[in-house]
Amino acid sequence: MKSSNLMNGYFNSHWPVECGGNRRQKIFYGSLNVANKTHHLTTKTNNRWNVMFIFRDNNEVYLTGTMPNFLGDKPFGWVKKVNPDNLETICESPNLECGEHIWCGAIAAHVNGTIINVNGSYMHVLDENCNILKEIKLPVDQAHNGLLILSDGSVVTKDIRVSNSVTSTLTRLNPESGELIGQPLKLPEGSMGRIACDIDDTGEYIYCLLYTSPSPRDPSI
């Protein structure tokens, strides 16, 4: 089931965020238009950590990732707009600061037309040509791997913890100014998985996979 309210914060696209939407159902809305078509495989190698594709407008495909620099050169995040037919780069962002944290990050197409990217301990707001509009240092100095846009357009992200020795935190931000909306919410445990979201008549809910227990179903989150 598709909820129009749940996706109000995203660009009007069939795949504006990882897994296609906040419920992470990986459902494609509309026709794939593959009947009577010929299969064609294109492979590109760039020696980078390629994380995910999203779609913005028709035939606007964006790829995000980071660098697998666990040793040696300082790592950085990046976003590029690619040709959907041959995967050639149309435009690419400058190197995106990640606070020297290496993890896969996330990307989304916002309803205001911008591209939101979270990588390491930074969030970047980019225009459709991958130019940096705003760089935001997140309040938690840790790699982040969760990114959702809520129905009001605000952005929520979560830091990742590879063990339960330190708790994770949910941070909500204004997509225009980059300012915090409320104080970051410290979860009761660490969380390695990504976050999901759903909405009903009583509120909008964020779900976090914790190490030993599920997150509370609390609309104040």
Mark where each language-model region is.
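A short beta-strand motif characteristic of beta-propeller blades
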Residues: 38-44, 88-97, 132-137, 179-186
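Beta-strand-rich domains and repeat architectures in extracellular enzymes and scaffolds
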Residues: 8-29, 33, 37-77
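Repeated scaffold domains used in trafficking and secretory/extracellular systems
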Residues: 48-53, 100-107, 140-149, 190-198
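A short loop-to-beta-strand structural motif that recurs across blades of beta-propeller domains
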Residues: 77-80, 122-124, 168-171
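Residue-level detector of Asp-centered blade-edge/turn motifs that repeat once per structural unit
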Residues: 56-58, 109-112, 149-152, 199-203
